[in-house]
Every structure is written in C-alpha cells, then in structure tokens.
Amino acid sequence: MTSFRYYTDGAATMIRKNGKYLREAGGWAFVLLIDNREDSVCSGGCPLTTNNEMELYAIYASMKDFLLKSESGDMVEICSDSSYCIDIFTKWAFNWQKKGWKKSDGKPIKNLKLIKAIWKLMANIKSKSCMLKFKKVKGHSSNQWNNKADELAGTAKNIAFKSGKTVYYGENDGLLGEKSKYVD
C-alpha cells in the first residue's frame, strides 16, 4: 500500500473600482508526497474565477492525479487550509446529495458543478478500493508543504492575472485541460 498526501491551495485576486470588478484571476496548486517524500507539484491559473473555486480546483486536480498514479488499496489524504472545502466533503455534501443537491434552506449551492465533479472522483477513488481522507491544516504557518502549495498557487494566479490567460504547470501536461473543460 502506497500513501499519497496532497497539500492543496487556491488563491485569487480581484480589483474593484466603484463597486465593479475590473479584473480578476486565480491560481491553484498541489504538492504531492508519496510515502512522506516529495514527489511532484502541479499548478495552474485562470482569469475570471474566485478563491473558493481555485481551492476546490486544487482538490479536483489532486484527485485526478491520484487516480492516474495509484493502485488498488492505496491511501490518499487531501490536506487543505480551506475550512470551506474540508466541510463540504466531510459534513455538507452527504446531505446535499440526499436532498437532490440542494441546501436545507433551499438556496443554491455555490460551485456546485465543481463540487459534483469532485464527488464523482471520490466515488471513483472508493471504487478502486482506495482509502480517502481529508485533513484541515493551518494556513500560512510552519507547514512547509502547505506553504509551498500557497506559493505555487500565488505565482500561477499572478501570471494568469497579468496575461489574462489560463496557465498550467506540471509533469502531466494536458492532465486537466482548459478551465472551461475541466468539469463535465
């Protein structure tokens, strides 16, 4: 059994003037440890996004990567400094799914398309007889792997912001495709 640990992070920048967004961009990243040794990193960025979407996308990308690299019985731990993301997949999504992907107050779920895509990947991981765990880590602290993911996400965000284009950096070029295509 191989142990995969992904440290994920997302970042976004928005410039507002007179209450209107003039320009925005975001970045995401993951750092992968296999059996507690750094194995690889992956990051990307795109215009017109939010911080929460990028946090979720980092999780999506890490799960896609895990499904490509893992074998039956492997273990994966997703480490994120986003309480929003951790709570979605450890507390809220189970009830949302039971209620037809609706919140108990009837309000729409933000980022639902991406959440459902991650939910589908979670099912694929389980069907592969792999164990999946989510872990909340403290952001901007002494955790070198979370700090590295934060730095990579910030760099990708800045490049996407300056260029206005989708960018991708990683060992598996084409793994994730264009932002507009990343979720079915």
What are these regions (language model features)?
Residues A11-N18, M63-K148, S180-V183:
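RNase H catalytic domain
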